[in-house]
């Protein structure tokens, strides 16, 4: 454990309290943190090294080096170094600024003060000076300086409360408690200074919810777990003081261990652009070779005789060597086909798009003051190409606000409402709820409409009392009183809050807890139970239990959990009650309610003592501790007596149905990945409109092994494609072209809508290598896919499967810690700021408060970003090919001498001054249709999914367009200058006038072209386009003026040329002719295309223009209700760890789903919906609505 290799050799950590000398021999990290990358001395070399690792920067650096060689450079060094230095400087300033703030943050944290026990005295020390093994005193509302073993606190039994918002985003308080042997130390400094315990524990890791260790002190060993540890980043709350021993410091703390780098994501356009840039480099080399060969031929055939003004010694250099030098010269001249400004412009545009998302008030959730946040600036255009959405349910599609609705106790349902004829009826506003106002500590917002439960409580039904007693005892809720004396519950899951609140209103009030006791008020009587054991929840157990001793001395085990798990633990005598309760659970799940089973067991005192002794031994074990504890839990949680079941409601979020429908019309497939049971998952599908009664079939895959799963998948495919048509070949399509062909086959083959439901157990087999192809083929042919009972790992595996084999852009959206792996795996990760903390938000690329904002994020911001980026790239490549290839044509008329056409300053400023701002304005602000029409017509989204706006074909069209423009730019002026004289009779066919004419023509042509490309004009577009032209002429006349020539005669030799040339009418005629010849074919083509073959976007633009002239009153969409048959389902899923229980069971009400945004459930047809939307009483709109074959 010594020297630099200690991390590799450390297998366990040994820490001795109050002994720095002992701990220093292990060379543990100190408490100083470093998140900064540079210092004053290392910034320049490290930053330059990082920047030149980028291929583009390294490429331009190589060009700069070539330009420093006089024999091959026709351009001076500043033509490359000016833009390169500009880019390098901008990036360096940005990196330096970011690192300055990191330094500032590091210093602020490292210089925080803590009271440290040194030499038997408490001394104020900076955090960075704290060492492993030190004992620290914390006071209320202080941040925790390092990962501490809690020794004692001001609260009884060594309890303390911490807020972990900086770790996991959760603002609710969590309880930690010290060992009883150390809690006795209290605040006695002398006893704390004499504490010399030795902790042997796990090595530093990033697991926030797990800790294993042993404290050896006074000849005895004590087991340590996560409840004894306070982590760095926590804040001490509601506790006057506490003392802790430093276990991990600085970079070894769990907070810093979790601050690893996020996986870098690149867009499909980035990957395509990298490929195209390589192609351009190849094209550039080919041009260089052609011109080099031309130079060699010219030198050998013409150069030797070309001696009128040039004199050199014969045989001084060979034609081949001349061609070699010319090759490199033209590589330098033609490098502007990929200017360095391209990469800077792309980042600026993406930054602008990110700000638009952050500033969008329509994605601002005013109830909680939560705006939409683009947490990355590199993925915006990818939002316009999404094909698959993978969504969590609870807290994402639903509100994750739980309400206790129904329960089954001893075979009887409570919570139903009956009429005078004892017939079950709907709950209406006229129905009076149970009056809880007489109970002073009741929750005023709680409502329950069945009065029979209160009657059973008053009559003293023992089963009802035991049921409510269990709800008040078996949980992880913390209680406190506010300033008004009201009882407040700190809950870690909304489910537990709903159950404990229900028990509270029915007279069984949870009051307080300590590590050894739980106090509740039972119908007015205060009762304290001794807490003997807490059997925590995890994803395998799917249940939690507490073992308590009541005042009469009886030992009880109370348990709640998933019915499938708990029913297996029941005593055989429960058979009749089990049947009744199962029926009730099916009924609850059919109504979309989240369910839990409730059971208990009476324990013999002798048996419990023997079991508890084994549990203590297992907790003290250093090997296989978890396995031994799990076995003991299984042993005691058996022969349970069933009490009943609970049913909690979780409503859909506002706007979910409309959003799902709209995204489906945009050809986006939504897969729900939930921890719910199968029936509940089906129910949420119906509630969200993803499943309908009109579907041809819903395939349910529930095989118990790989063979059964494979057979079910293949049988489903046979049903889908037909018995006599063997479509599948067992292979998954990977290329986009093949995928489009596959889609066309499916359209011909599948005549209806299908859905796939698969549970987690079957999914585990379906994800095996020999079955996953069948799963993926079937799933991708279905309109809806719902995976239920899935683990966080399976969620990520499903996303990776589609990413890898479908070549499709994926998006994952969720709100909880169990969604983090899925969010990180997808191309785009979206976090919902919900009830389950901020883990998902912190791991996401984009975040907002409501699922409905996903519609605007994709259909508006995503589509616009893709549209703008594609137009930007098309124009940028066109502009630079038109600009650069003029040199190629000129080479044939200048003896392939690598002479440039333009002035060197024009070459330097063309991309960074003359044409940079207009294209940026278009890339940031342009839009084809308004945001409202983007939402109302989801089919506008499809071009992005099919990569229609920028692909290899579009690139070649841009290249050909640029080549044509370069031909016009060169040959029209060349032909005009071939034999021409000015108005004064003087010959004007000089090189300088020719260069000025071509440069002016180029600036005007590309400005006119961007004006034609701009669909949405703003004040900024006008200023940038006309301003750029004005800047060009201002700089041109300045550089050609007598004044600048007098100061820099060598750099600006074209004195007076601009004034002389641009005062000639024939020059302006040439410029006009060049401009018209360049843009008229484009104007003609676009006019014919829009008139004869309009896209959907073209038609919507026509409609927008017509709407400005005649704006008819908007009509509301028809509202319909769907009645559905009862579908049963249960829900249960938790996050692992103490107190994070019952947080991902997922249900929804299937009958009469609640209104969302004024729309309960609307049946849309993709064609008729768009037609109805766009029929607006004008001829243009009428023709649009009648055109049912929309060309994308």
Curated annotation (Swiss-Prot):
Catalytic reaction(s) noted: ATP + H2O + phospholipidSide 1 = ADP + phosphate + phospholipidSide 2
**Per its record, how is this protein called by name?**
Probable phospholipid-transporting ATPase IM
Q: List residues in topological domain: Exoplasmic loop.
A: 67-72, 299-327, 893-904, 977-990, 1041-1060
Signal peptide region: none
Q: In which tissues is it expressed?
A: Ubiquitously expressed at moderate levels.
Q: How does it assemble?
A: Component of a P4-ATPase flippase complex which consists of a catalytic alpha subunit and an accessory beta subunit. Interacts with beta subunits TMEM30A and TMEM30B.
Q: How does it sit in the membrane?
A: Multi-pass membrane protein
Q: Which residues lie on this side of the membrane: Cytoplasmic?
A: 1-44, 93-276, 350-871, 925-954, 1014-1019, 1086-1192
Natural source organism: Homo sapiens
* Enzyme class (EC, first level): translocase
Keyword ATP-binding present in the record's keywords: the answer is: yes
Location of the active site: 392 (4-aspartylphosphate intermediate)
Q: Where are the transmembrane segments?
A: 45-66, 73-92, 277-298, 328-349, 872-892, 905-924, 955-976, 991-1013, 1020-1040, 1061-1085
Q: What is its EC number?
A: 7.6.2.1
Question: What is the superkingdom listed in this entry's lineage?
Answer: Eukaryota
User: Record's family?
Assistant: Belongs to the cation transport ATPase (P-type) (TC 3.A.3) family. Type IV subfamily.
Annotated function = Component of a P4-ATPase flippase complex which catalyzes the hydrolysis of ATP coupled to the transport of aminophospholipids from the outer to the inner leaflet of various membranes and ensures the maintenance of asymmetric distribution of phospholipids. Phospholipid translocation also seems to be implicated in vesicle formation and in uptake of lipid signaling molecules.
Comp. bias regions, Basic residues: 1104-1125
């Amino acid at each position: 454990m010594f020297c630099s290799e200690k991390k590799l050799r450390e297998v366990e950590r040994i820490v001795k309290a109050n002994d720095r000398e002992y701990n220093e021999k292990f060379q543990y990290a100190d408490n100083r943190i470093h998140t900064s990358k540079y210092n004053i001395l290392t910034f320049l070399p490290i930053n330059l090294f990082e920047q030149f690792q980028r291929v583009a920067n390294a490429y331009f650096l190589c060009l700069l080096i070539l330009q420093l060689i006089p024999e091959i450079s026709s351009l001076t060094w500043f033509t490359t170094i000016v833009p390169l230095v500009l880019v390098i400087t901008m990036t360096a300033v940005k990196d330096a600024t970011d690192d300055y703030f990191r330094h500032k943050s590091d210093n602020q944290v490292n210089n925080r003060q803590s009271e440290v026990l040194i030499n038997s005295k408490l001394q104020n020390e900076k955090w960075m000076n704290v060492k492993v093994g030190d004992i620290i005193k914390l006071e209320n509302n202080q941040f925790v300086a390092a990962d501490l073993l809690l020794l004692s606190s001001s609260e009884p039994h060594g309890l303390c409360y911490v807020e972990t918002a900086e770790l996991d985003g959760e603002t609710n308080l969590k309880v930690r408690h010290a060992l009883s042997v150390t809690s006795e130390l209290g605040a006695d400094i002398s006893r704390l200074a004499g504490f010399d315990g030795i902790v042997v524990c796990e090595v530093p890791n990033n697991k926030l919810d797990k800790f294993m260790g042993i404290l050896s002190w006074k000849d005895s060993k004590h087991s340590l777990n996560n409840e004894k540890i306070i982590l760095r980043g926590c804040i001490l709350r509601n506790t006057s003081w506490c003392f802790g021993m430093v276990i991990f410091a600085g970079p070894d703390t769990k907070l810093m261990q979790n601050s690893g780098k996020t996986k870098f994501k690149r867009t499909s356009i980035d990957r395509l652009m990298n490929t195209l840039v390589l192609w351009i480099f190849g094209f550039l080399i080919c041009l260089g070779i052609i011109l080099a060969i031309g130079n060699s031929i010219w030198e050998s055939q013409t150069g030797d005789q070309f001696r009128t003004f040039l004199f050199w010694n014969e045989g001084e250099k060979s034609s081949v060597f001349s061609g070699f030098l010319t090759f490199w010269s033209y590589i330098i001249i033609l490098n502007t086909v990929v200017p360095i400004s391209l990469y800077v412009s792309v980042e600026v545009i993406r930054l602008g798009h990110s700000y638009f998302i952050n500033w969008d008030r329509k994605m601002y959730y005013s109830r909680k003051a939560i705006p939409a946040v683009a947490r990355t600036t590199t993925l915006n255009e990818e939002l316009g190409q999404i094909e698959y959405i993978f969504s969590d349910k609870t807290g994402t599609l639903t509100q994750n606000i739980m309400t206790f609705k129904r329960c089954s106790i001893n075979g009887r349902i409570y919570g139903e409402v009956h009429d005078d004829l004892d017939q079950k009826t709907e709950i209406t506003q006229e129905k009076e709820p149970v009056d809880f106002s007489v109970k002073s500590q009741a929750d005023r917002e709680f409502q329950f409409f069945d009065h029979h439960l209160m009657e059973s409580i008053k009559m003293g039904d023992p089963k009802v009392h035991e049921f409510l007693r269990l709800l008040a005892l078996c949980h992880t809720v913390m209680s406190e009183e506010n300033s008004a004396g009201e009882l407040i519950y700190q809950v870690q899951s909304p489910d537990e809050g709903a159950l404990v609140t229900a028990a509270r209103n029915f007279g069984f009030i949870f009051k307080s807890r300590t590590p050894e006791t739980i106090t509740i008020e039972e119908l007015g009587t205060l009762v304290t139970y001794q807490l003997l054991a807490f059997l925590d929840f995890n994803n395998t157990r799917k249940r939690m239990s507490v073992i308590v001793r009541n005042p009469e001395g009886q030992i009880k085990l109370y348990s709640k959990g998933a019915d499938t798990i708990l029913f297996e633990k029941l005593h055989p005598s429960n058979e009749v009650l089990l049947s009744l309760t199962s029926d009730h659970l099916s009924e609850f799940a059919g109504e979309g309610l989240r369910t839990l089973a409730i059971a208990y067991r009476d324990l013999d005192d002798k048996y419990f003592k023997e079991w508890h002794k084994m549990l203590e031994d297992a907790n003290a074990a250093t090997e296989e501790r978890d396995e031994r504890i799990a076995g003991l839990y299984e042993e005691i949680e058996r022969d349970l007596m069933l009490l009943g079941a609970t049913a909690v409601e979780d409503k859909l979020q506002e706007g979910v149905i409309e959003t799902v429908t709209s995204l489906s019309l945009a050809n986006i497939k939504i897969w729900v990945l939930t921890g719910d049971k199968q029936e509940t998952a089906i129910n949420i599908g119906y509630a969200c409109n993803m499943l309908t009664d009109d579907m041809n079939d819903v395939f349910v895959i529930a095989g118990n092994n790989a063979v059964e799963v494979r057979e079910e998948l293949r049988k489903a495919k046979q049903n889908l494609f037909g018995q006599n048509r063997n479509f599948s070949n067992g292979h998954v399509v990977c290329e986009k072209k093949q995928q489009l062909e596959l889609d066309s086959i499916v359209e011909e083959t599948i005549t209806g809508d299908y859905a796939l439901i698969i549970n987690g157990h079957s999914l585990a087999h379906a994800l095996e290598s020999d079955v996953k192809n069948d799963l993926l083929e079937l799933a991708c042919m279905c309109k809806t896919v719902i995976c239920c009972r899935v683990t966080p790992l399976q969620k990520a595996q499903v996303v990776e499967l589609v990413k890898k084999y479908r070549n499709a852009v994926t998006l994952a959206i969720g709100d909880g810690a169990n969604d983090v792996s899925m969010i990180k795996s997808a191309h785009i990760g979206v976090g919902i700021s919900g009830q389950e903390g901020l883990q998902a938000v912190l791991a996401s690329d984009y975040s907002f408060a409501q699922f409905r904002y996903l519609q605007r994020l994709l259909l508006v911001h995503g589509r616009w970003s893709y549209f703008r980026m594609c137009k930007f790239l098309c124009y940028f490549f066109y502009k630079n090919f038109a600009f650069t290839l003029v040199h190629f044509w000129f080479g044939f008329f200048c003896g392939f001498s690598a002479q440039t056409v333009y002035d060197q300053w024009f070459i330097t400023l063309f991309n960074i001054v003359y044409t940079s701002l207009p294209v940026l304005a278009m890339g940031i602000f342009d839009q084809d249709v308004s945001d409202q029409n983007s939402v109302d017509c989801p089919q506008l989204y499809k071009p992005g999914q099919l990569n229609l706006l920028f692909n290899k074909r579009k690139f070649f069209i841009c290249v050909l367009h640029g080549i044509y423009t370069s031909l016009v730019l060169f040959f029209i002026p060349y032909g005009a200058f071939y034999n021409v004289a000015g108005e004064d009779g003087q010959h004007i066919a000089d090189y300088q006038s020719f260069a000025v004419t071509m440069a002016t023509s180029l600036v005007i042509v590309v400005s006119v072209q961007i004006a034609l490309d701009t669909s949405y004009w703003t004040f900024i577009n006008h200023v940038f386009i006309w301003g750029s032209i004005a800047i060009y002429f201002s700089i041109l006349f300045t550089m050609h003026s007598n004044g600048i020539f007098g100061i820099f005669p060598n750099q600006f030799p074209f004195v007076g040329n601009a004034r002389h040339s641009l005062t000639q009418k024939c020059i302006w005629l040439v410029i006009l002719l060049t401009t018209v010849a360049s843009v008229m074919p484009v104007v003609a083509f676009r006019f014919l295309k829009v008139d004869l073959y309009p896209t959907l976007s073209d038609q919507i633009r026509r409609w927008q223009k017509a709407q400005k002239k005649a704006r008819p009153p908007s009509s509301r969409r028809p509202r319909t209700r769907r009645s559905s048959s009862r579908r049963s389902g249960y829900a249960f899923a938790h996050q692992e760890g103490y107190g994070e229980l019952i947080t991902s069971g997922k249900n929804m009400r299937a009958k009469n789903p609640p209104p969302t945004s004024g729309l309960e459930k609307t049946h849309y047809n993709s064609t008729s919906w768009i037609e109805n939307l766009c029929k607006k009483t004008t001829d243009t709109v009428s023709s649009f609505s009648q055109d049912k074959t929309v060309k994308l």
